[in-house]
């Protein structure tokens, strides 16, 4: 009971913080380690904000990856999707700034199988009653949104701390749990 109550109180406080600052905050940035539950949290937060009368729009920073041939590599020569340089920061900021001033934007979609970015059909224009829910590992990195007024942003850090145990003596660490989640996600949704 106590842990569930604490989660409910925490969730309600987040809702109130965003609602009370809604006139200024138009971007909620969600960050956390790889496979920590950012996308799931974004979906749940969106539903909570809808209950409060807000209209959230979810955007994944992963859709702003540079094309595969421009993706940086780590010391082993493997693609480093967790590097900030793997993101087209200029396009990301251009899109955010355009949305905040009421311009129409063509939002990108990254195809992990082809390693290329494409675009959704049509354009998107942010309405006054909408808030952007943006999730990605660099969501709280100040270098991701250097030209966005901090008063317009609200940041949330998410981490999967739930422990799973094989038995009473053999717990699976949070890091290993995230690795398992990442392997399943990459296989099911990213083609590798």
Regions found by a protein language model. Give the residues of each.
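Conserved nucleotide-sensing/catalytic segment adjacent to the nucleotide-binding pocket
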Residues: 71-113
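Single conserved hydrophobic/aromatic residue that forms the stacking wall/gate
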Residues: 2-14, 18
């Amino acid at each position: 009971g106590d842990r569930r109550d604490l989660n409910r109180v925490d969730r309600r406080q987040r809702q109130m913080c965003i609602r009370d600052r809604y006139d200024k905050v138009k971007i909620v940035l969600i960050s956390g380690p790889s496979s920590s539950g950012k996308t799931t949290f974004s979906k749940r937060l969106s539903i909570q904000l809808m209950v409060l009368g807000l209209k959230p729009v979810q955007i994944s920073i992963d859709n702003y990856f540079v094309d595969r041939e421009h993706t940086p590599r780590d010391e082993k020569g493997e693609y480093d999707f967790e590097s900030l340089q793997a993101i087209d920061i200029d396009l990301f900021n251009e899109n955010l700034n355009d949305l905040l001033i009421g311009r129409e934007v063509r939002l990108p979609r990254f195809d992990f199988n082809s390693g290329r970015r494409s675009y959704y059909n049509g354009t998107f224009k942010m309405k006054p009653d909408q808030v952007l829910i943006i999730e990605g590992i660099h969501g709280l990195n100040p270098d991701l949104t250097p030209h966005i007024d901090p008063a317009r942003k609200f940041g949330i850090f998410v981490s999967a701390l739930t422990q799973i145990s094989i038995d009473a003596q053999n717990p699976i660490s949070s890091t290993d749990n995230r690795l398992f989640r990442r392997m399943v996600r990459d296989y099911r949704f990213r083609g590798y």
